[in-house]
Regions:
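Conserved nucleotide-sensing/catalytic segment adjacent to the nucleotide-binding pocket
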Residues: 148-199
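Pre-Walker A (pre-P-loop) alpha-helix and adjacent loop at the N terminus of AAA/AAA+ ATPase modules
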Residues: 55-60, 67-107
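Conserved RecA-like P-loop NTPase ATPase core
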Residues: 1, 69, 121, 139, ...
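A short hydrophobic beta-strand->loop->alpha-helix junction that borders the nucleotide-binding pocket
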Residues: 137-147
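Walker A/P-loop nucleotide-binding motif
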Residues: 99-121
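A short, basic N-terminal segment
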Residues: 1-77
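Residue-level preference for the first positions of well-ordered beta-strands
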Residues: 104-108, 134-135, 168
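Post-Walker A helix-loop "phosphate-sensing" segment adjacent to the P-loop in P-loop NTPases
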Residues: 126-136
Length: 199
């Protein structure tokens, strides 16, 4: 590589995707590879933020960690299983289904309104972002609204695909009982397309 970090002539500088480039196994090659990985994630995150304006971890959740969640739930033993599941997902990248004993790469917390599901999930997405992964935190109503608003300007498919391909997504208030009105076929289709793709 002559200390360029590349094997061959294809480089991201020249507009080739990282998949097309061959990075050298030497120390320089690994530094160059890590640089382009960080740059790729930063671009993906910036694109996500353009497509879903305001979609990020809300300020009042940003300081939540596993330790702070455990401390908040110290007198609520019924939350232990959910917190343990989030910790397992952070630690090993999957959760063992307690019923089927199969491993799942996704994590869903269900329960009544105001029980702390969102706060409990926060450390998972924070950890992923800190590890250099792209992420999307968005309420389902805002997500569906963003897709539907894309019908007017032709960005609905681009937005849906971005949400499908982001490294980590936190959909808040999925199945919100307090929402007025029945679920429309369009809303169901949008949510199905996202969940089915990621499943």
């Amino acid at each position: 590589c002559a200390d360029t970090g590349y094997q061959g002539w294809k480089t991201p500088h020249a507009g080739y995707s990282m998949e097309e480039c061959i990075f050298c196994e030497c120390a320089t090659g690994q530094r160059v590879l890590e640089y382009w990985k960080r740059k790729s994630v930063a671009k993906k995150q910036a694109d996500m933020e353009k497509l879903f304006v305001g979609a990020c971890i809300p300020a009042h959740f940003r300081s939540f960690t596993l330790d702070s969640i455990r401390q908040r739930a110290i007198n609520e033993p019924d939350k232990k299983a959910a917190i343990d599941a989030v910790e397992q997902w952070i630690t090993v990248g999957y959760v063992e289904d307690p019923v089927t004993k199969r491993y799942k790469s996704g994590l869903v917390l269900a329960g009544d309104y105001g029980r702390g599901k969102t706060g409990t999930m926060t450390p998972a997405i924070r950890h992923s972002l800190e590890q250099g992964k792209s992420g999307l935190w968005i309420e389902v109503t805002d997500f569906v609204g963003a897709i539907q608003s894309g019908y007017r300007d032709g960005t609905s498919l681009e937005r849906l695909e971005a949400a499908q391909k982001v490294d980590v997504i936190l959909l808040d208030d999925l199945g919100d009982k307090s929402r007025d009105g029945a679920e429309t076929d369009d809303r169901r289709r949008i949510i199905y397309q996202l969940v089915n793709y990621r499943h």
